[in-house]
Amino acid sequence: MSTATGPEAAPKPSAKSIYEQRKRYSTVVMADVSQYPVNHLVTFCLGEDDGVHTVEDASRKLAVMDSQGRVWAQEMLLRVSPDHVTLLDPASKEELESYPLGAIVRCDAVMPPGRSRSLLLLVCQEPERAQPDVHFFQGLRLGAELIREDIQGALHNYRSGRGERRAAALRATQEELQRDRSPAAETPPLQRRPSVRAVISTVERGAGRGRPQAKPIPEAEEAQRPEPVGTSSNADSASPDLGPRGPDLAVLQAEREVDILNHVFDDVESFVSRLQKSAEAARVLEHRERGRRSRRRAAGEGLLTLRAKPPSEAEYTDVLQKIKYAFSLLARLRGNIADPSSPELLHFLFGPLQMIVNTSGGPEFASSVRRPHLTSDAVALLRDNVTPRENELWTSLGDSWTRPGLELSPEEGPPYRPEFFSGWEPPVTDPQSRAWEDPVEKQLQHERRRRQQSAPQVAVNGHRDLEPESEPQLESETAGKWVLCNYDFQARNSSELSVKQRDVLEVLDDSRKWWKVRDPAGQEGYVPYNILTPYPGPRLHHSQSPARSLNSTPPPPPAPAPAPPPALARPRWDRPRWDSCDSLNGLDPSEKEKFSQMLIVNEELQARLAQGRSGPSRAVPGPRAPEPQLSPGSDASEVRAWLQAKGFSSGTVDALGVLTGAQLFSLQKEELRAVSPEEGARVYSQVTVQRSLLEDKEKVSELEAVMEKQKKKVEGEVEMEVI
């Protein structure tokens, strides 16, 4: 078969020519549109009232915001086309901003101070704007240099009509993508130094080479001392949380829980930073709205509108749950972190909590967040350490924030587990391949178990040891559990209850050393357990109050107890003896004698305490004096009072008490150590805590006003759309 030859025969393309043709076609397609996932960090308008007049000023301000944890990265897509650079919403692909290539004044990769990788810088000058905008982006999959080359190639093609430079840039981009580098290795997280995490990390490094000082977990402190390894125990041997896992695992457990706390603080601060950015964007939009002459959307407003959008209800719920979780975790870690301690770190959360409550419309929304429940230790930590202003906020949030989970109805569904913005998850198993339990849920389970185990115990702690079927008549006649108050007690805060000697009180919760009781007037509060003794209680078939029942005909006298020695005679007031309780009838004489001796010792201690508490000339204590506050405007006397209130030694107080607040705030850690080698680091930590509290207070008022305006504006737009 002959093969056609000659000029009319089409030449057969070679493999090389086919490859070149496909390469040219691929280049045309690639040169048309490219798209990059990026994080938008911040936008500055040059010349506005924030001290940013040049690109260098913008870079320096970004570094300052980054060091303060005020940079909120917002993920989006950056698309480069032959005539525009467009920003898109990554989920909906909605166009946020579109900048003509002719409006791009500068495109560069810059390295702000304190960063390890470059950022993409875009300076855009719109015709209708007097000053250009400066945008900073962080590449997620590719470095800023490659994205810059693509945009600069598009600019060169736009201005000269020649596309070789962009084609080369896109080929370099494809080669980089084909290397399939790990995103985690390519893109480190945005540099943030949250104040609380930095303080905790400093404590860890100073305390034990980056590890917290691991002490027994809270439930081990309150439970009975565990038996030596190899011995048997009757205390719920099936529960792994009642016994320690050994000193090494105790340290690992403390480290794990401190790490969880760090990530909770990270997420809370990230959310607050987002609120601040949203408020700033709303303020800029409002400023532009007042100066706008036409209804056409100005350049840059799509990005600002997205930033000004407040968080969703689910996001508010998530951060409020994490704050509740942090309260319980701080109480659990009370023995593992110091300088600052858990009570001091507690104050860090109230600034964000106040801001979140205000921007969500008030305490009603936060009150609806029931999970996770607070532990009893968390409620005690809050009750004993909040300031009057914090207490006002705390009590406004309702029972789900002020009462422990033991007093609330159980929630349906799986236990709460925090999910962190960064995707981090705590280790699942320990080195022995045993599963770690969630620390807060573990504490709640322990408290429930402890209450169940203590319920049938004898009247040493006010409980009855009666089987329901053994005393049906008594069960029907006595409502609840009743105690007699032996001493006057004056409440010191809103959660405590003032009581008088010989008051009959109903016990609502006796799981801790402070019992929750109700007086005859129906008022509830906490009183110390060691001023109370068991009382039979009022009879339901009598129409009389507990207070009147005390003065009415007393019940028949119980069987007499063994007479104590004369030197330890009991007080004269009338009250039931230990062996007057029916629950002791089944005990042998040696056990009865043991309980009698316990009562004797307890009464002697109470009598000695009463000598210092009561007396005819004893003044009724007033409300607790407010703790001295430190600020840059404090004088030397206020600084001295603040140092004394924090418990520093007289040498440290004398050395630093001559400074003003501004001078003390200006000192660095090494300078404080030079003045006081033993306590300099702790002074620096306390000053850091105080500085953060002051910064939070300054931010709240401005943010509240801006968010309220933004909320009204959004509501107005919704109403207009409905109309």
From Swiss-Prot:
According to UniProt, the tissues expressing it are described as:
Detected in placenta.
Q: Output compositional bias ranges, type Pro residues.
A: 553-568
Question: What residue spans carry the Polar residues bias annotation?
Answer: 543-552
Question: Which residues does the UniProt record annotate as the domain SH3?
Answer: 478-537
Keyword set, alphabetical order: Coiled coil, Cytoplasm, Phosphoprotein, SH3 domain
- PROSITE patterns from the xrefs? SH3
Taking every annotated instance into account, which residue ranges of this chain make up the domain PTB? 35-164
Q: How does it assemble?
A: Interacts with ABI1. Part of a complex that contains SOS1, ABI1 and EPS8L2. Associates with F-actin.
Q: Matching PANTHER family, A to Z?
A: EPIDERMAL GROWTH FACTOR RECEPTOR KINASE SUBSTRATE 8-LIKE PROTEIN 1, EPIDERMAL GROWTH FACTOR RECEPTOR KINASE SUBSTRATE EPS8-RELATED PROTEIN
Q: What is this protein called?
A: Epidermal growth factor receptor kinase substrate 8-like protein 1
